[in-house]
Regions:
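N-terminal acidic, glycine/proline-rich low-complexity segments
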Residues: 1-129
Length: 129
């Protein structure tokens, strides 16, 4: 989730999207602002000073459409499935000699935020039939 934490939709972007859907009277589009406001409020409490709503799922789907805009590395990873302090956390092993019990996965380290932002805005500011 570290990379997806940076896939931010800012309040200014949300206002622009909402104004567009109000002007076009797009009822489906009008659900976007309340949804993103909900996430922004949640993340503002858990991460004060965050600049907007992280779009974890959006950036994951966006990556499938734009694999050239994301930098990946193959890294041995273990997910902690057991209850306790590490529950749900992923441990990436960056050492040269790794634990053979860790499976290797692709991890995203960087993505083209400006391109992501442009694509999000082009998608949400498109008039539907």
């Amino acid at each position: 989730l570290n990379v997806t934490q940076h896939a931010i939709v800012t309040p200014e972007m949300v206002q622009q999207i909402d104004a567009f859907h109000r002007n076009t009277q797009d009822l489906a589009g009008l659900i976007i602002k309340p949804m993103l406001d909900y996430y922004y409020n949640f993340y503002s409490k858990s991460n004060p000073g965050i600049g907007g709503s992280p779009m974890h799922d959006f950036v994951t789907i966006w990556y499938l459409l734009n694999p050239d805009a994301v930098r990946l590395s193959k890294v041995p990873i273990k997910v902690i499935p057991d209850q306790g302090e590490g529950f749900g956390q992923s441990i990436a092993d960056f050492r040269f000699v790794t634990n053979p019990g860790y499976k290797t996965h692709n991890i995203a380290f960087q993505f083209n935020y400006e391109r992501f932002k442009r694509d999000i805005m082009e998608t949400f500011l498109r008039k539907r039939l």
